[in-house]
Amino acid sequence: MAIIKCKMCGGELILIDGASTAECEFCGSVQTIPNLDDEKKLIQFERAERLRKQCEFDKAAGIYETIVADYRQEAEAYWGLVLCKYGIEYVDDPATGKKIPTCHRSSFDSIMEDGDFEQVLENADVMARKVYREEAKQIEEIRKGIIAVSANEEPYDIFI
């Protein structure tokens, strides 16, 4: 059986055959997983996730694009593109100890209206769709907060 690493902490996920979600035995997060039907695809996912965790979002997105080109119905690859587009890294919340998303790239565009996110929802099953929506709502709240803060900042000039 394939070993899939947690998107949040890097621990091994508890996999159940045929399931589209898994629970991390270390941090307890429930998350979506790719279809486990192809070893080549799983290796590509592993490499893309490693790059994304290192905040190499453009390189990771390139690998996710390759996966999407080869496997058009793979919701997890589209989700990887979304995470890269918004520069999502999961960090420890000092208050709760849980992993929460942080955005390294801000955008005026809503994650809920993103074309790749629409592909995620279209290609995901019911269980995975619920997890994707919950994570997207969390990311959307962060994005809105960033936009609100930037709207209240004084304009400034930069001289080089």
Regions found by a protein language model. Give the residues of each.
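Short cysteine-rich clusters marking metal-coordination/redox-active sites
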Residues: 6-9, 24-27
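Residues immediately within or flanking Cys/His clusters that coordinate Zn2+
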Residues: 3, 21
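Short Cys/His-rich micro-motifs in 6-15 aa windows
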Residues: 28-37
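Conserved N-terminal substructure of TIR/SEFIR domains
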Residues: 144-160
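Short, charge-rich amphipathic alpha-helical segments embedded
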Residues: 62-96
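Cys/His-rich microdomains that often coordinate metals
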Residues: 10-13, 31
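Alpha-helical segment of the N-proximal tetratricopeptide repeat
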Residues: 39-66, 70
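Short coil/linker segments at helix-helix boundaries
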Residues: 37, 87-142
